[in-house]
Amino acid sequence: MAPRPLGPLVLALGGAAAVLGSVLFILWKTYFGRGRERRWDRGEAWWGAEAARLPEWDEWDPEDEEDEEPALEELEQREVLVLGLDGAGKSTFLRVLSGKPPLEGHIPTWGFNSVRLPTKDFEVDLLEIGGSQNLRFYWKEFVSEVDVLVFVVDSADRLRLPWARQELHKLLDKDPDLPVVVVANKQDLSEAMSMGELQRELGLQAIDNQREVFLLAASIAPAGPTFEEPGTVHIWKLLLELLS
């Protein structure tokens, strides 16, 4: 099929995306960019660690703040980049990690979302960049600034899986040392591909076995306010191990 000619609206959107990409990169460099130090010991199995749960959140009371001692030092920060095609479930993944219930329907991210999650030893900053075609061009600019990449894939979207594979391998090639967690999302759907099929179709079996690439299942679907999906807890546990 011959490529369609670009109309004025498409050109305008492309220019806006270019500006947005530049702004995103500046924001990232200003607030999160600090380079990356390797922390993952390949001799330690992440699945053997103590069971982890999603972060718990308490109501903030201004009266409590007056009685608290000032912090002696700030917690170190760890950066996680969350990418994937539009509609894969990146925003829902961030909501679930932050203790919020998933939203009904699909609301695309026009720009980025960010979440900061506290742990005992450090704070985890997760940045999601939208998965529209115009924004994918800028993904590679961010991978060298983070500690871990999370790549979310819609397990039921067979039609666009080749595009997901292409974008994933671009990122893998950009930084051979970056740990990558591939989230096989929407495994609860009847049409979802199996983990074995996804591993083949995403070309993960061809990756050097010395590379830190993990494929984990998730079923991040709308549910009640007490929703806590086991797959997401498993992913959070792995992230803590990779970031420690």
From Swiss-Prot:
GO molecular function list: GTP binding; GTPase activity
InterPro entries named among the record's database cross-references: ARL10, P-loop_NTPase, Small_GTPase_ARF/SAR
PROSITE patterns the record matches: ARF
Matching SMART domains: ARF, SAR
GO CC list: mitochondrion
Chain residues that bind GTP: 84-91, 128-132, 185-188
Gene3D superfamilies (UniProt xref): P-loop containing nucleotide triphosphate hydrolases
Keywords associated with the record: GTP-binding, Nucleotide-binding
Stated family: Belongs to the small GTPase superfamily. Arf family.
Descriptive protein name: ADP-ribosylation factor-like protein 10
Species: Homo sapiens
Originating gene: ARL10
